Amino acid sequence: MLTIAMPKGRIFEEAVELLRRADYALPPEFTESRKLVIDVPEENMRFILAKPMDVVTYVEHGVADLGIAGKDVLMEEERDVYELLDLHISRCHLAVAGMPGAKMNEIAPRVATKYPNIASTYFREQGEQVEIIRLNGSIELAPLIGLADRIVDIVSTGRTLRENGLVELERIAEVTSRLIVNPASYRLNGGDIERLVDRLAAVIPQP
């Protein structure tokens, strides 16, 4: 049985649709269940539903053979997992944003984000010295209350930025969801995993 860790929310819904297009017989109530572990014996699969940042932890430690995670999470966490396939779902991008025309702190601008590793790497590569402030939610609030000069966050439509009077300043990276695998599981279950990859690859939406 292959165990697949999946994040709750939008990625989960799009991933389930992709699996169904690949002719995996997931029951109709699959997306409505409140269970965190769901067995699908007809397909010899088990699904673990988790927070996005936890998916890579489950895969890295081998409690899940495979996982579906956003490229943003993979960039931030840098875990010991293999990236098998770009699923081309949940498309968005990482960006730097801030108040239009706002003056930056000249010594070390403060940047609020839930992606401290990505932000640190990006600004270091840009030759900018910044102070990173880690937040877990409502990142857009930071410039509005004077906590930070800029933010680094995921942008999908840009609506949240606009509604809070912020503008996108720089684009860091494109983000889609990826199929990842535990290295040991890949060696032990390579045949089953490759069949899954082939079936998904055949139905992936093209960019």
UniProtKB/Swiss-Prot annotation:
EC annotation from Swiss-Prot or TrEMBL: 2.4.2.17
Protein name: ATP phosphoribosyltransferase
Name of the top EC class for this enzyme: transferase
Keyword Cytoplasm: yes
One Pfam short name: HisG
Subcellular location(s) of the protein: Cytoplasm
InterPro entries: ATP_PRibTrfase_cat, ATP_PRibTrfase_CS, ATP_PRibTrfase_HisG, ATP_PRibTrfase_HisG_short
The record's note on its domains: Lacks the C-terminal regulatory region which is replaced by HisZ.
GO terms for biological process, alphabetical: L-histidine biosynthetic process
Keywords associated with the record: Amino-acid biosynthesis, ATP-binding, Cytoplasm, Glycosyltransferase, Histidine biosynthesis, Nucleotide-binding, Transferase
Gene3D superfamilies named among the record's database cross-references: Periplasmic binding protein-like II
UniProt GO cellular component terms: cytoplasm
Residues forming coiled coils: none
Catalytic activity as recorded in UniProt: 1-(5-phospho-beta-D-ribosyl)-ATP + diphosphate = 5-phospho-alpha-D-ribose 1-diphosphate + ATP
Entry's family note: Belongs to the ATP phosphoribosyltransferase family. Short subfamily.
GO molecular function terms attached to this record: ATP binding; ATP phosphoribosyltransferase activity
Oligomeric form and interacting partners: Heteromultimer composed of HisG and HisZ subunits.
Signal sequence extent: none
Pathways involved: Amino-acid biosynthesis; L-histidine biosynthesis; L-histidine from 5-phospho-alpha-D-ribose 1-diphosphate: step 1/9
